[in-house]
Amino acid sequence: MLCAVYKSSRKADTYLFVKKRDCFDDVPAPLMEMFGVPKLVMVFPIAKRDALGMADIQKVRAAMEENGFYLQIPPPQVNLLAEHKLSLGIKD
């Protein structure tokens, strides 16, 4: 199975994996609206890959089989100031 990866034009570090290039039929309309204009990053055969950058390859494969797409969002940012205050015993 081929996999096309698109970068969001609205959300930083957000990627959409779909089964076919330029085929977003399985992606819900509200998600596409939030995602913005998709910008193609790459197309590759997912069956031949053992790993992906930040995404778990098994989760990507499972989501694409079940839903027809996979949405990769960035991990939440760590609030270093809040962690520092907490380490000093300062509560907001």
From Swiss-Prot:
YcgL domain location: 1-85
Superkingdom field: Bacteria
One Pfam short name: YcgL
Gene3D superfamilies named among the record's database cross-references: YcgL domain
InterPro entries (UniProt xref): YcgL-like_sf, YcgL_dom
Sections of the chain in a coiled coil: none
PROSITE patterns for this protein: YCGL
Protein name from the UniProt record: YcgL domain-containing protein Sbal_1869
Organism annotation: Shewanella baltica (strain OS155 / ATCC BAA-1091)
